[in-house]
Amino acid sequence: MEILDGKIELPKGFVASGVFAGIKRSKKDLALIYSERLANISAVFTTNRVKAAPVILDMERAKKGKAQAIVINSGNANACTGEKGIEDAKSMAKKVAEVLEIEEEDVLVCSTGVIGVPLPMEKVLKGIEVAALSLSKEGGYDAAHAIMTTDTFLKAVTVKFNVEGKDITMTGFAKGSGMIHPNMATMLSFVLTDASVEKATLDKAFKNTVNRTYNMISVDGDMSTNDTAIVMANGMAENKAIQEGTYEFDLFYKALEYVNKTLARLIAKDGEGATKLIEVNVINAKTENDARLAAKAIVNSNLVKTAIFGEDANWGRILAAVGYSGADFDVDKVDIYLKSAKGEVKVCENGSFFAFDESLAKEVLKEKEIFIIVDMKAGEFMATSWGCDLSYDYVKINGSYRT
């Protein structure tokens, strides 16, 4: 598998664009993705009971498992906007269908930005016309920039692999920085591939990888109204349709998991005001669910986040998070390690105090990527979660978001 981190190379049959429509004060704010051929899709949405209008629309349209275009705007979430919000989301899809000469039902809509403000539809509809005229094979970068809100860098990856002599390309790009919490929050992710994949197979692969990647990240514990992750597979590589239980499926799954994992880590790394990426590895748990519960609790703990920001090896906060996570474990067996490029230090042994080198721990925590390893010593299962520290800048950014 060839890996192109940070690169967007649109697969066969896909074009994209990103333009300035005027929703935001400046910068690109409207993206369009189009496939020459109707594609199989799978999608996962926010679990927040308060769902944005485009999420409500997409959840219904995604049931048929087909789509040909996605329109995305940033700067306005079109959430908590009532029936008018639903009408506006439908109008966006209708406009895309008109300019691309495709079926309206084959258009998905995504929005991200400020909640509770109506969309400036005149600007949006005009922007869609411009975006359609701007579609190109090189337009992926513009599209990726157009979906960003408080993001500080582009989040993208492309992988290439071969299936039975057919070259497959898979590219993904995402946005997400704040209001990120396990089970999908304020993040949009789009994975495009020219592979031919059976619908049921695509569904299983995508939902499994989402569960192990996007659903294992946390920036601030807030859950958004707009989360959406979509994969489109248009089959234009002309390979035999991939089915579960085959060698070809294993290749496809590995590629999809890599793309989603890479994007999830980048989202965690770009947490609003973040100075450090945190990766939590819970190992030797009794069950996978126990490992997931513990890993998610640690990465979501504000006390752990602030300790990492302050470069304080406060292992008690880590153990406390495991304690309230709901995981089944014996506290008298738990070991905790802190690790980075500067080395590794054990800070807790068998659930209690361990005489560790404080100066080494301080050096370890000075790095930009910090690994927390929790050994439950209870079984064979493991889970990984990603997050970031919590800094003073997080408050500054979110205290003035609307201004």
Swiss-Prot record:
GO terms for cellular component: cytoplasm. Pfam families: ArgJ. It is an enzyme of class 2 (transferase). The record marks 112-113 as: Involved in the stabilization of negative charge on the oxyanion by the formation of the oxyanion hole. Its main location: cytoplasm. The active site is at 186 (nucleophile). InterPro entries: Arg_biosynth_ArgJ (IPR002813), ArgJ-like_dom_sf (IPR016117), ArgJ_beta_C (IPR042195). The record marks 185-186 as: Cleavage. GO terms for biological process: L-arginine biosynthetic process; ornithine biosynthetic process. It catalyses: N(2)-acetyl-L-ornithine + L-glutamate = N-acetyl-L-glutamate + L-ornithine; L-glutamate + acetyl-CoA = N-acetyl-L-glutamate + CoA + H(+). Keywords: Acyltransferase, Amino-acid biosynthesis, Arginine biosynthesis, Autocatalytic cleavage, Cytoplasm, Multifunctional enzyme, Transferase. Substrate binds at residues 149, 175, 186, 272, 398, 403. It comes from the Bacteria. Its EC number is 2.3.1.35, 2.3.1.1. Heterotetramer of two alpha and two beta chains. Belongs to the ArgJ family. Catalyzes two activities which are involved in the cyclic version of arginine biosynthesis: the synthesis of N-acetylglutamate from glutamate and acetyl-CoA as the acetyl donor, and of ornithine by transacetylation between N(2)-acetylornithine and glutamate. This is Arginine biosynthesis bifunctional protein ArgJ. It comes from Caldanaerobacter subterraneus subsp. tengcongensis (strain DSM 15242 / JCM 11007 / NBRC 100824 / MB4). The gene is argJ.
